[in-house]
């Protein structure tokens, strides 16, 4: 028996779970535009207030994947998504975007799923455009980019057209809802491996278990205890790791990898252009905090991509990729490849 939106709302008010099949049904109504904006707003707010469960999030992500314009990648060995939920309020340069270039230079295939900045001064789409990358690609062009350069950027609005049905509701509500945590769970290229940064410590255990239910292979969900949705240099980082179907939760520290713990304050930027400059300096092997945090995150991404057997081994590969100039070359490679599709 399907649940009505009114029954679902009542369930959230009573702090009771919406079951898997019911959540699938409700989410399909929202994505098709068959639920009124008032009911959609009430339900997603109700879910937020009662706190979304692992089952509810997994069901919602399943439907969002159903409605996505997919990127078909033939060989998914060492294939990883590097993504953050955003919303951490740290306003740093685009660490995960810089990480993509280093990971690709060290042998991973990266499908980065991202958007323009909402809470940040510069989203991944903004900084890639500032670098000269054409982000407006069709799914088959993204697949070609991954095959040719080892990197593909999927601009979220191009791959999730059904999101336009809920976008006005989200905009008007102006508060975090389940949709803020669905983005990183709905990679249109279905990368089996992932490094995912989250904006709240509670999400570490939740998101890694959602990915477990969604059938992912090797995932590291991270939260820097200084509030960053990245592996942090300024504090310990909480990690939820899914590997071989098993979940482990632990903490890592910069010192574990021979790195100094330093404040992330110097990584703040005010614009996409400032982010571009800092990203290029890090990839250009300029000594400093930016290079170190990119190295740390790239090492973690290479471990999640199974290119490296440990984070420590990944960090060494990342250092080599930056020092050799290969990471910086990857920027020019992606710009050249994507510009041929300029419309």
Curated annotation (Swiss-Prot):
The keyword S-adenosyl-L-methionine does not apply. GO terms for molecular function: anthranilate phosphoribosyltransferase activity; magnesium ion binding. It catalyses: N-(5-phospho-beta-D-ribosyl)anthranilate + diphosphate = 5-phospho-alpha-D-ribose 1-diphosphate + anthranilate. Keywords: Amino-acid biosynthesis, Aromatic amino acid biosynthesis, Glycosyltransferase, Magnesium, Metal-binding, Transferase, Tryptophan biosynthesis. It comes from the Bacteria. The keyword Glycosyltransferase applies. Homodimer. Catalyzes the transfer of the phosphoribosyl group of 5-phosphorylribose-1-pyrophosphate (PRPP) to anthranilate to yield N-(5'-phosphoribosyl)-anthranilate (PRA). This is Anthranilate phosphoribosyltransferase. It comes from Burkholderia mallei (strain ATCC 23344).
């Amino acid at each position: 028996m399907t649940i009505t939106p009114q029954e679902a709302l009542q369930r959230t008010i009573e702090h009771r779970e919406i079951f898997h099949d019911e959540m699938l049904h409700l989410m399909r109504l929202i994505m098709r535009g068959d639920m009124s904006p008032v009911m959609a707003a009430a339900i997603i707010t109700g879910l937020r207030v009662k706190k979304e469960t692992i089952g509810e999030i997994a069901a919602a992500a399943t439907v969002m994947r159903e409605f996505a314009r997919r990127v078909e990648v033939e060989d998914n060995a060492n294939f990883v998504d590097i993504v953050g939920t955003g919303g951490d309020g740290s306003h740093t340069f685009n660490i995960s975007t810089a990480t993509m270039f280093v990971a690709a230079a060290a042998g991973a295939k990266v499908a980065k799923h991202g958007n323009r900045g909402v809470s940040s001064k510069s989203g991944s789409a903004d900084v890639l455009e500032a670098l000269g990358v054409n982000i407006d690609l069709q799914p088959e062009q993204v697949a070609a980019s991954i095959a040719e350069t080892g990197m593909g950027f999927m601009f979220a609005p191009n791959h999730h057209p059904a999101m336009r049905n809920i976008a006005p509701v989200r905009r008007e509500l102006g508060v975090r809802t389940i949709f803020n945590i669905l983005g990183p769970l709905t990679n249109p290229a279905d990368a089996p491996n992932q490094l995912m940064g989250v904006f709240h410590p509670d999400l570490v255990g939740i998101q890694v278990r959602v990915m477990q239910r969604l059938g992912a292979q090797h995932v590291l969900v991270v939260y820097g205890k200084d509030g960053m949705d990245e592996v942090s240099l300024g504090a310990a980082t909480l990690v939820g790791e899914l590997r071989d179907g098993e979940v482990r939760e632990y903490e890592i520290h910069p010192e574990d990898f021979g790195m100094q713990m330093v404040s992330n304050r110097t990584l703040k930027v005010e614009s996409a252009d400032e982010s571009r400059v800092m990203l290029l300096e890090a990839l250009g092997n300029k000594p400093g905090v930016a290079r170190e945090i990119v190295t740390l995150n790239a090492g973690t991404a290479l471990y999640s991509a199974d290119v490296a057997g440990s984070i420590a081994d990944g960090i060494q590969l990342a250092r080599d990729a930056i020092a050799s100039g290969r990471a910086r070359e990857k920027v020019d490679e992606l710009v050249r490849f994507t510009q041929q599709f300029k419309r």
